[in-house]
Each structure stands twice: as C-alpha cells, then as structure tokens.
Swiss-Prot record:
Gene Ontology CC annotations of this record: membrane
InterPro entries assigned to the protein according to its UniProt record, in alphabetical order: Alkaline_phosphatase_core_sf, Phosphodiest/P_Trfase
Extracellular topology ranges: 52-485
Enzyme Commission number: 3.-.-.-
Pfam families: Phosphodiest
Keyword GTP-binding: no
Protein's name in the database: Uncharacterized pyrophosphatase/phosphodiesterase C725.05c
CDD domains listed in its UniProt record: Enpp
Keyword terms, alphabetized: Glycoprotein, Hydrolase, Membrane, Signal-anchor, Transmembrane, Transmembrane helix
Localization of this protein: Membrane
Length: 485
C-alpha cells in the first residue's frame, strides 16, 4: 500500500528531430557566425568551421587482436559510475579519468533519458530504448495491468522477468550470437530474458568494494579463450550514494570521486600488465548527474489537493500520481492545474502534465506503467508534504536527480579508449543521448542490433566548437546554479 512516509526511501540506490533541436540549441551560441552570414558571405565557410556545432558521423571500428600470448576477440568493458556528473571530471580529483579523456575519446557529456533516474537509464544504455519502450519507467512504479508495484531495492523485482522483458539487453543479443557476456550488478542482469542469461552474472550487493569490482573484471579477462567474455558490464553505485547523502558540492563527494579514480588507475594498470590496454575497449560512463537540494526549494503539496486521493506515487523525486480510479486521476490533475494558476508562491517552480501532454522530447507517455498525472519540479526543487517531511528538520537527501534530462546538472559522463575508438583520438565529439550506447556496443561486437531508439547506428558525432569542454561544462553549471539561488 502506498505511504507518503516512505517517499524517497528506496531512491538512494535522441530521435532525429530531437538531435536537430539539440544542435540548434548550441548553434544559437554562434551569434558571430550567424551575423557573418549576412554581411561576410565570403567568410561563411571559415566561420562555420570555427564556431558552429555540427554533427559529422564517423564509424567505430572493430576486430580481434593478439597480446603476445593470447588472441582476444573484439572485447568491450562498460563501467557505469552511477551519478557521476560530467563536470566532476574537472575538480582536480580524477587524474586517471582526466588522462584517459585527454588521450583517448571524451564526449563533453552524455544526455540521459527522461526521467534522469538510475534504473530507467541503465536499462536504456543496454537496450537502446527509451524508458517508455523498455518498460522500466522509474526506480519505483505501479503496473496497472498486473496490479504489482516495482521497487528497485526489492530483490523479487530484480529477479522477476515480467518487469524486464519489454526490452532486450545487449547481453541477450550477445549470447544469442555466441558472444559470451559477463555482467556485474547491472539492473536487469538477474533474470532470464528472451530465453538467455549472461554467461557470468553477479547480483547486486551493496557491500562489494570498488577494488572487488576491479578484481572481478580482471578475473574475467584472465579466463582461457574458450571461457573469456567479450562483453563485460559493471555497475558502481558509490558516487551516487555519496551525492545523495552529502550533496554534489560536498567534500565527501570529492573524496569518493578520488577513490573511484584511484581504482580506475589500478584497473588500467591491470590491463597494461596483460598487454591489452591498447586493444580492449573500455567505456566509462554514468547514468545521470546530481542537483543540490535546499530547505529553501521545497514545494509543499498539502494545500494543493487531498493527498489521500493518491494510491501510488512514482518516480521520486518527481510526482507521478495515480489514483484508485479515473475520477481520482481527474481530481488530482484538475486540482494541480487550478493551483498552478493561482498567485501563491508555491504555485511556481513546477509544471503539471497529464500523461498525454508530457513534452514529446521526453518520450515518456507511451506505456501503461507511466502514471496518468505528473508534477515535474524545476531542477533543484523538491516535492514534499507534512506526511513525509517536518518543516522543523533539514530536508534530506542533500542531492537529487530525475529532472529534465537536458539540464546541465543532469549531464552524464562518457570516456572511451581502445582499438575500436582509434579514429576518434584528438577529435572533438558532440554530446549524444544514451540511447546510442547500444548501437556502439553492437558495432564493436559485430552483433545485429535489435530495433532501438538510437539514430547514429554505432557511429559517433563530431562537433566544431572552439570552446574547450571544460569551459563549456563549467560555464553551463555556473549558469544552472545561479538559477537555484
């Protein structure tokens, strides 16, 4: 049964048109180039090359290799650093990651899918599908067809294939095509999906240390050729957990990203000792960023509508509301619409949508598991009620995600190295949405991709932009933070 007192307790754990809109967003920054078109026609080409954001698609390459002892088939390692915001890279605590980014392939940021929450985005990364398509629409949600509730921290949900079979993860396609996979604690890896499981699979365990995760990857790579996996995926929740508990700007956050970076350095050294560091493809990415919370950015729901009308609330910290009946849904929606039109201060900093009116760029309406009424707070704002938070206490957690996936504070990480990415060294890559990762992995492993929402088909886009990635990210973060004051 839904209880407001439990809100947040379990949360610590582009289509072509979208791409065009996104590129246009950055093209607007090139005011000098646009003006020059009108008055300096002879210089148009030069200005476009210097200033404009322009996607040029280049393919990824694959192939086997020999490290001097063993023949390795095309191999890719994907390591997810949950909650690692793109700009964390420039805080001075991650020299190993920064070195990898500077010497290999670095995308300024990876665009998460909406909502920018852990489970939906991890399943998007391995299926190439938007959450509305693969069905894991939040960390917690209700399925009106089965009458069951999904909660990410409940083992029975992670082991029930009926939650996961709307999407086919990359390891299923790999196993079907005789490519061995090894999956460490990735959402969805504990179930049989479309008749397949990973060759090697580790269930989630909060107590597993970063070094144990690193050792597990190297252990798999040390297997004999007949047993060795070509696709390895590993999940690390540590940055996200600390970001929630202490906030994205805390000393504790800087400590944990430093610890993560040290272990990444040890992993790279392990690859070098095996003489495979130049050949094995390794991708470090994240699912979303993190925004700071504040007692000054709370949106109180108590006076907006009768909270007892809510039978299920989904997608914390967002408000996906579902009543016991259609009449309850209508009441909740109309109450929020009417309140939003008032002149009260609490009527600001959020938007209300019916499911059918959710912005199309979020791709978040075409699934029965998506709640009928949505209250979306502005970035950094939190929905609360007297039932789950006392005004006399400091609001927790101190860091939250889930907001608009184009917000600078929701931006994710993408760094890659290895033989398949050699054509991209020294190139300035353009940001892309995480629906593209599936195609990249399929291309590296020479797998026939299943239908997905990616549009680059295993390629990567280049950008033309004079600003450094560091300047770009930090300026956008500064502007985003200025709106929170």
């Amino acid at each position: 049964m839904f209880s407001w007192a439990n809100i947040g307790s379990n949360e610590y754990l582009p289509l072509k048109n979208d791409r065009k809109a996104y590129l246009n967003q950055w093209a607007k920054r090139s005011g000098l180039a646009i003006a020059a078109i009108c008055i300096l026609g002879i210089l148009i080409l030069a200005i476009v090359k210097l200033f404009c954001f322009k996607a040029i698609i280049f393919p990824i390459v694959g192939g086997s290799f020999n490290n001097g002892t063993n023949v390795f088939q095309s191999t890719v390692i994907v390591i997810s650093l949950d909650g690692f915001r793109a700009d964390y890279l420039y805080r001075g605590f991650t020299p190993n990651l920064l070195s990898l980014a500077e010497r290999n392939v670095h995308v300024p940021f990876l665009i998460p899918s909406f909502p920018s929450i852990t489970f939906p985005n991890h399943y998007t990364i391995v299926t190439g599908l938007y959450p509305e398509s693969h069905g894991i629409v939040s960390n917690n949600f209700f399925d009106p067809v089965t009458g069951k509730q999904f909660v990410n921290s409940m083992p029975e949900c992670n082991k029930d294939p009926t939650w996961w079979d709307k999407g086919e993860p990359i390891w299923v396609n790999a196993e079907r095509n005789n490519v061995r996979s090894a999956v460490h604690m990735w959402p969805g890896n504990e179930v049989e999906n479309h008749g397949y499981r990973p060759t090697y699979s580790d269930g989630f365990n909060f107590d597993t240390t970063l070094r144990e995760k690193k050792d597990r990857i190297l252990e798999w790579l040390d297997l004999p050729d007949k047993d060795r996996p070509q696709l390895l995926l590993a999940y690390a929740p540590h940055v996200d957990m600390v970001g929630h508990a202490f906030g994205p700007d805390s000393p504790e956050l800087n400590i944990i990203i430093q610890e993560v970076d040290i272990v990444i350095g040890e992993l790279i050294e392990g690859l070098k000792k095996r003489n495979i560091d130049k050949h094995v493809n390794i991708i470090f990415l994240s699912d979303h960023g993190m925004a700071p919370t504040s007692d000054n950015r709370l949106i109180w729901l108590d006076n907006m509508f009768n909270l007892s009308a809510v039978a299920h609330r989904d997608a914390w910290p967002l408000g996906g509301f579902r009543g016991e009946s259609d009449l309850d849904d209508e009441y909740i929606y109309e109450s929020l619409v009417n309140y939003s039109r008032s002149s009260l201060p609490s009527a600001e900093n959020w938007n209300v949508y019916s499911k059918k009116d959710i912005p199309s760029r979020w791709h978040y309406s075409n699934n029965e598991r998506i709640a009928p009424v949505w209250m979306i707070p502005d970035v950094g704002w939190s929905l609360v009620s007297m039932l789950d938070h006392s005004p006399e206490l400091e609001y927790e957690p101190l860091g939250v995600h889930g907001y608009d996936n184009l917000s600078p504070v929701m931006r994710a990480l993408f760094i890659a190295s290895g033989s398949s990415f050699k054509n991209f060294k020294g190139k300035k890559l353009a940001p892309f949405q995480n629906t593209e990762i599936y195609g990249i992995l399929s291309h590296i492993l020479d797998l026939p991709a299943q239908p997905n929402n990616g549009t680059y088909e295993g390629a990567l886009p280049l950008r033309r932009n004079r600003n450094s990635t560091k300047e770009w990210l930090l300026k956008d973060i500064e502007q985003a933070y200025s709106k929170l004051i």
